[in-house]
Amino acid sequence: MPLGLKPTCSMCKTNTSSMWKKGSQGEILCNNCSGKSSTAAGGNNNNNSSSSTSGSSSYTGTTFASTSTSQQSNGGNTKQSKQEIHRRSARLRNTKYKATPAAEKKVSTKGKGRRHIFKLKNGLYYQIGDVVSVVDEEDGKTYYAQVRGFIQDQYCEKSAALTWLIPTLSSPKDGFDPSTYIIGPDEDLPRKMECLEFVCHAPSEYFKSRSSPFPTIPTRPEKGFIWTHIGPTPAISIKETMANH
């Protein structure tokens, strides 16, 4: 309907209504006339339904009997099918619970511990506490460190966490003497095993020992000990120093 034109009911010709509706043939109806048309349509439907019921009552009794018997037979079949489904589900449930549990696999820890403690690289087993050398690319000098732990990523690349060893004045320039080195700082980032070169095996607590690796003069006489030197130079004769005191 164009904008600005007032609608007009096709039945009562009124121009005012709270609600406008369209009929089955597209005519415009007001709210009162649309209710009257719906009640009239309902009455026609009731008449049609009554006529259909009266026509259906002319059927013979044999037809109703046949339909009732077929419904009863269908009901019996559905009950039997439900019982069969219930029995099948019960069988499945029983067999599921009666299934034997899978045999547990025995985990052997003989080789697992060795893999955690040792790392094979270039045909050599590395372990925690080993002393390795690292060559600096800038100055070409060799630095020594002690292995603190091992790391292996998802691509099987092996790395090692290092603790640097600081040389002293008595440390040799061409080789490595563990008794002349002291423990240094721990490195935060691990280094790949390809950058490391094996030097020697050593206990993990060797450089953290509270007692000095160098021979010291005891403050009180001690018996039952055998004195020997640890450093690269001959030790001081302890017996002579004790005799002088």
Curated annotation (Swiss-Prot):
Gene this protein is translated from: gatad1
InterPro entries in UniProt: GATAD1, Znf_GATA, Znf_NHR/GATA
Q: Tell me the GO molecular function terms.
A: sequence-specific DNA binding; zinc ion binding
- Originating species: Xenopus laevis (African clawed frog)
Q: GO CC terms on record?
A: nucleus
Report biased composition (Low complexity) as residue ranges. 39-70
On the tree of life, the source organism's domain of life is Eukaryota
Does this entry carry the keyword Zinc? yes
The entry's protein name is GATA zinc finger domain-containing protein 1
Which PROSITE patterns does the annotation name?
GATA_ZN_FINGER_2 (PS50114)
Q: Extract the ranges annotated as region (Disordered).
A: 39-110
Keyword Iron present in the record's keywords: the answer is: no
